[in-house]
A protein has these predicted regions:
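Phosphate/pyrophosphate-binding catalytic cores of soluble transferases and nucleic-acid-acting enzymes
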Residues: 1-310
Length: 310
């Protein structure tokens, strides 16, 4: 019988953390956070990390892995997760992967990181090209390196073009060759069965929960936490300082919005994130795995609809 990995995804404020605790306790399982912000030390309130008490009750992984000044991308998370899966399974326990960061979740289901090495010199070369010649400069060099083949990229998205050019230069290959090589990579965790579910709520109920959560974060000291993070060099990490909640507090601290505008701004940012999360979950998980929780209710671990994942 194959070992099984369990995946609990959910939009922000859906109640997945409470459900994860309940399910893990009932199954003698451990929890692996799949959140691109919770992995940073000091980003506690905005990431809604589990309390110290919860972390004592149930072993948690994937939290507080890096300083806010460090770069921590999906490739590092992927390697870390592989170690956690191996260790937890070796102890004969179940593992519940919990989160809402789509790209990080994706690393459990399909290859997302290839072996192209991009040196600092290449990165600087590409950035200088973009600064001097803009998108047109990137497209010209990509066209030359790819011998006129269609790029298959959003040609108005500079970030995508920058990364594509870096990978072409780092590998010496065309994008079509890189894609072919990437598609031949093995499926992650192919030896495991995978059971998935994702939590969601009706919009009106979710809106109320988002507002309540935001008010609570501010009352507990999100502004002060952000000030401390800034002192520690947080602004040098774009992924961290542009995340929902923290980005809005930074705007407030720069006097771009007022205190009265802060909570509505965070709520608006959170709703946009929820929309992105839903799109990803619909694409990745079968519709049968969606668990829609009714208003003013909490999900119960014995009433879940798990579906097989691939």
């Amino acid at each position: 019988m194959r070992e099984c990995l369990y995946f609990l995804a959910g939009v922000t404020s859906s109640g997945k953390s409470a459900l994860a605790m309940s399910w893990a306790a009932s199954q003698n399982a451990e929890i692996l956070s799949c959140d691109s912000i919770a992995l940073y030390r000091g980003m506690d309130l905005g990431a809604a990390k589990p309390s110290a008490e919860d972390r004592k009750r149930i072993p948690h992984h994937g939290l507080d892995l890096a300083e806010v000044t460090e770069g921590f991308d999906v490739s590092k998370y992927e390697r870390y997760a592989q170690r956690v899966v191996s260790e937890v399974v070796s102890r004969g326990k179940k593992l519940l992967v919990v989160g809402g960061s789509g790209f990080y979740l994706q690393s459990f289901f399909e290859p997302i990181v290839d072996e192209v090495v991009v040196t600092d010199e290449i990165r600087e070369q590409v950035e200088n090209l973009y600064e001097s010649k803009g998108i047109e400069g990137l497209l010209d060099q990509l066209g030359e390196l790819n011998q006129g083949e269609p790029l298959g990229l959003d040609e108005l998205n500079p970030r995508r073009l920058l990364r594509a050019l870096e990978r072409c230069l780092g590998s010496g290959l065309k994008l079509s060759q890189l894609r072919e090589r990437f598609e031949s990579m093995p499926v992650p965790y192919a030896s495991f069965a995978k059971q998935c579910l994702w939590l969601d709520r009706e919009n009106e109920d979710l809106e109320a929960r988002i507002e309540s959560r935001t008010v609570k974060m501010i009352e507990m000291g999100l502004v002060e936490e952000t000030e401390t993070l800034i002192e520690r060099g947080f602004l040098a990490n774009p992924a961290a300082c542009s995340s929902v909640g923290y980005r809005d507090v930074c705007s407030y601290l720069r006097n771009e919005i007022t205190r009265d505008e802060l909570i509505p701004a965070i709520c608006t940012s959170t709703r946009k994130l929820v929309s992105k999360q839903r799109k990803w979950f619909r694409k990745r998980f079968p519709s049968s795995s969606r668990n829609l929780i009714g208003p003013n209710k909490e999900s119960r671990s014995d009433e879940l609809n798990w579906s097989s994942g691939t």
